[in-house]
Curated annotation (Swiss-Prot):
Family: Belongs to the peptidase S8 family.
MF terms (GO), sorted A to Z: serine-type endopeptidase activity
Induction text: Expression is strongly increased during growth on protein-rich medium. Expression levels are the same whether keratin is present or not in the protein-rich medium.
Domain named Inhibitor I9: residues: 38-117
Domain Peptidase S8: 128-399
Gene: SUB4
Subcellular location: Secreted
Protein name: Subtilisin-like protease 4
Job of this protein: Secreted subtilisin-like serine protease with keratinolytic activity that contributes to pathogenicity.
Signal peptide interval: 1-19
Carbohydrate attachment residues: N102, N252, N308, N395
Keywords: Glycoprotein, Hydrolase, Protease, Secreted, Serine protease, Signal, Virulence, Zymogen
Record-level GO BP terms: proteolysis
Residues annotated as the enzyme's active site: D160, H191, S346
Length: 399
């Protein structure tokens, strides 16, 4: 295991070397680092051939160092290529890490960290109020008023704990995508099914006609890794590109961890590629600037509101928050059938992901959707937090 303090001293000795890559330390004191696991990001302009040559070289160096020192490091684990933003994740010893940092083609390296869902489960039955709230300027209505196109022709990627794609709320519109978390292609937690139901469920969802793709990046305990999240995002962009739906797609990330430049860069590339990205602000009642992917400027960062148009007590806040959406006591689907109630910025984010798909289905450009949602939003949130918007999601129904 590499101690970050020792590593900082170790790296400082090479600070004068212009070619040396930057080792980024995450900026959140509560970040849970994964020992000896690193995310390596290549410089812009590195060709596919040079990237492959670098991968081959690192694999060879790792094998040599492992044989020489008898370490138990696993080496290269996965590669990323999100619209020519290239990198990889690996389990490396200190000497291999030194060689990576000395390669002039490497932009930066950061240590992998644990990422968790941003939702809190509640086991009581409560009526869903979010749909009515986002389609009316005033609080109190239980009617959801919406254009009947409802996201038709748009695909939403649920990057989460998996999705029960056979749940009756999806009516055949959901399919399995990929799994970067484990070997169990099922939602054993329930979080991912709930968020998917919120963004595109027939009964509980915003974009009732959108297609749904399950991208499992978190396990049954609701946790995963930054590298696994990036691998999931990588899949979404490549899948959308292969299917010709860039410009007709959205992505929901109801998850987060400490600040990660690599995580932020990955979601930014996805957004710039033509996928509208909604992310949860986080549930620690703290400034969301210290969290990723919430702190990525290009995405739509969502805080949570209550039925009374107040900031949810748990919701993160701050200048990176783009909009509020219903997140307390939200009812939606659960794996195996039926429904359950959950609270969190995890529940707020899919309201915005679904609304993004709704807008895209009516002709909006994914790159402009967040700005459009902020223009439409209602100035309704009381005590939103220091330097935080008070704008609440609204679909422009005229009600």
């Amino acid at each position: 295991m590499v101690c970050l303090k020792t590593l900082s001293v170790f790296l400082a000795a090479f600070a004068a070397a212009d070619a040396r890559a930057v080792f980024k330390t995450q900026g959140h004191k509560n970040s849970e680092m994964i020992p000896d696991n690193y995310i390596v990001v290549m410089k812009d302009g590195v060709s596919q051939d040079d990237f492959k040559a670098h991968i081959s070289s690192v694999s060879s160096i790792h094998s040599t160092n492992k044989a020489k020192r008898g370490t138990n490091t696993e080496g290269m684990k996965r590669e990323f290529d999100i619209m020519n933003w290239r990198g990889y994740h690996g389990h490396f010893d200190r000497d291999t890490l030194e060689e990576i940092l000395n390669d002039s083609k490497v932009d930066y390296v950061e240590q992998d960290q644990v990422v968790r869902i941003s939702g809190l489960v509640t086991q009581r039955s409560a009526p869903s109020w979010g749909l009515g709230r986002v389609s009316h300027r005033q609080a109190g209505s239980r009617d959801y008023v919406f254009d009947d196109s409802a996201g038709r022709g748009v695909t939403i990627y649920g990057v989460d704990t998996g999705i029960d794609i056979n749940h009756q709320d999806f009516r055949g519109r959901a399919r399995w995508g990929t799994n970067t978390a484990d070997r169990d292609n099922a939602d054993r937690h329930g979080h991912g099914t709930h968020t998917a139901s919120t963004f595109a469920g027939t009964a509980y969802g915003i974009a009732k006609n959108a297609n749904i793709v399950a991208v499992k990046v978190l396990g049954s305990d609701g946790s995963g890794s930054t590298s696994g999240i990036i691998a999931g995002i990588n899949y979404c962009v490549q899948d959308a590109q292969q299917r010709g739906i860039l410009g007709k797609a959205a992505m929901n990330l109801s998850l987060g961890g400490g600040f990660s430049q690599a995580n932020n860069d990955a979601v930014t590339r996805a957004q710039n590629a033509g996928i509208f990205v909604a992310v949860a602000a986080g549930n620690d009642n703290k400034d969301a600037r210290n969290y990723s992917p919430a702190s990525a400027p290009a995405v739509c960062t969502v805080a949570s509101s209550t039925i009374n148009d107040s900031k949810s007590s748990f919701s993160n806040w701050g200048p990176v928050v783009d909009i509020y959406a219903p997140g307390s006591d939200i009812i939606a689907a659960r794996p195996g059938g039926g429904s359950t109630t959950m609270s969190g910025t995890s529940m707020a984010s899919p309201h915005v992901a679904g609304m993004g798909a709704y807008m895209i289905g009516m002709g909006a450009n994914p790159r402009q959707v967040c700005d459009r949602l902020k223009q439409l939003a209602t100035a309704a949130i009381r005590n939103p937090g220091f330097s935080t918007t008070n704008r609440l999601l609204y679909n422009g129904s005229g009600q």
